[in-house]
Amino acid sequence: MNSSKEFAVVVPCSGIGKSFGAVSREAAYELCDELRPNGTRLLALAKLVLGDSEARELLAEHRTVTIDGCKQMCASKMVKQSGGTVINEVAVMDVFRRHKELKPEGIAKLNESGLKLARVLAEEVAASLDATGSSMKGSSHE
C-alpha cells in the first residue's frame, strides 16, 4: 500500500486566545482520538513553524488535512510552505455558518455549543477522509 494513504496528517490552527482556534484544536482531538484513531496522525502547527525536520518529512510522505480557526488560514499556509499536500482545507467559520446555533464561547475551555461545533466539524472531516480512502492505518500525536 502506498504510504501516503496509510493515514492522513491533521494540522489544526494554534489560535491561542480565540474561540474558533479552540474549536479547531478540539475538532482535531475528536477526529484523531475518537472518530478516526487508526487513520489519522495529529501534528502540532508549532513544529512546522519551528521547521522541525521530522514534521516536514511526515508532510512530505502523507496527505494532510488542515483545520483553521480564522481567515488567515495559518495551518494551511504553513503546511503548503513546508512541502505538504493539503487534501482538505477546513475553516471553522464555514462550519459555524452552517450551524449558527452552535456558537462557541470560551478559550481555555469551550462551552457546550463550542464542543458540539467541534464534533460536527470532526465528523465532516472524518466523512471526507472516508470518501478519499485516507483513514486506514496509524495514529498518534506529534
Locate each region found by the language model:
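Redox-cofactor binding/interface segments in oxidoreductases and associated redox assembly factors
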Residues: 66-67
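Iron-sulfur (Fe-S) cluster-binding modules
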Residues: 1-46, 52-63, 73-142
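Short, polar loop motifs at secondary-structure junctions
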Residues: 70
